[in-house]
């Protein structure tokens, strides 16, 4: 990776207003931006976390996540995307304020009506109905992104001391066949399903997750 060979985008500022911020890369490869102000440095960190989290649930039942400070503060998978959003919000409606919202399927008008009640920075989905877009555009600064089908980077890079750390991305997802029952009482099939679901959330949580 050579920053000098990448497209550079000057951000409003870095993590704090007194810090300069830049993005090297092509966001247009990943998103179509339909509405709202420009993404900030902190927005990009949250959006990156949101996209990587939802990648774990690609092609599954309607799933909705609300992120704050790079972590999911609400998450649900339900029969409809509206119910997934409502239940994700119920996880922590306080932290959801000003958060990043992401869905793994199209957002319809009913879901947009619910979202519109919340102050949120960014909404991400693979598509939106025309009615949903009209509702979500009701807030001038709300950023509305359409996520494209794209391969995400297979390596993670960060600076450390006077150099750079590089590691392979964690693509391992636990399966039922990987589990060993270490207790006298074995979990039920539903409990195993819940544990595997939770493990994908834990994998994408930046803390000592339990």
Description of each model-found segment:
Residues 1-133, 139-171, 191-209:
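Active-site loops and adjacent core secondary-structure elements that bind or stabilize anionic groups
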Residues 174-190:
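Active-site/ligand-binding-proximal alpha/beta "capping" segment
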